[in-house]
Amino acid sequence: MYKRQETDSIDRHIAFNLHLADSIGALSGGRYDVTVKPLVEAWGFAGRQAERHPDVDSILAFVGREKVRVEEGRLVKADPRVQLDFNSIAKGYTVDLLARLVESFGARNYIVDIGGEVRCKGVNRQGGPWRIGIETPFDGNMSDGEYVQKRIRLTDGGLATSGNYRRFYLDADGNKVAHTIDPRTGRSAVSRLLSVTVAAPTCAEADALGTMFLAMGADDALEAVRTMPDVKVYFILADGADGYEEYISPAMEAMIMQ
């Protein structure tokens, strides 16, 4: 986004997304940063062919939130090669905008779902809570609901799931390269944390938090969650060759359907 050094005035959507990204970034210890786009492109996850051996150190010179500032309503970048990537928020934010539109027509009970990013309110046709299936995160699972690990009750708010089991490839050495990039190292954030589901007041917030936890990796994400008593998360982690381990935060437990 924006390959010039200075932009025209940013609109309210960009301003909101940037503010939310900064809020999540402050929680992440440097693992969540929307200036990650040059790295995403180099690893082949932005519609470009992956570089065989990306020059990560050189690219990192153009990554870092401190390299972008807002000045008189415009984005100003330290270098024109700095680029912003709001993909970790945009789908959730779009869901929120659609939910707002639905409510403007007077709907009291609804669900908006774009590719697993969900915002809902009220109850379903049977008068019960909305039930959201969380996929089993085996590599290449494109079944769209055929393999469900858990179901979650939701009556009001947003829900988003992030995972590295769909968008990935194996490099020349057989190593898994997933689309979630750690902006500190410039490399794929692959760990035994396979899937992250977050419930939050808005889908945009849930979307961004899910990406943050995934980028942190299993150990750091679990440690972070334990310092956030109100966060609602469901983690699926690899356990051995084919097994799974689950972590459900105390605030999420009542939402899990057994």
How would you describe each model-predicted region?
Residues K3-Q258:
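Mature catalytic core of soluble alpha/beta enzymes
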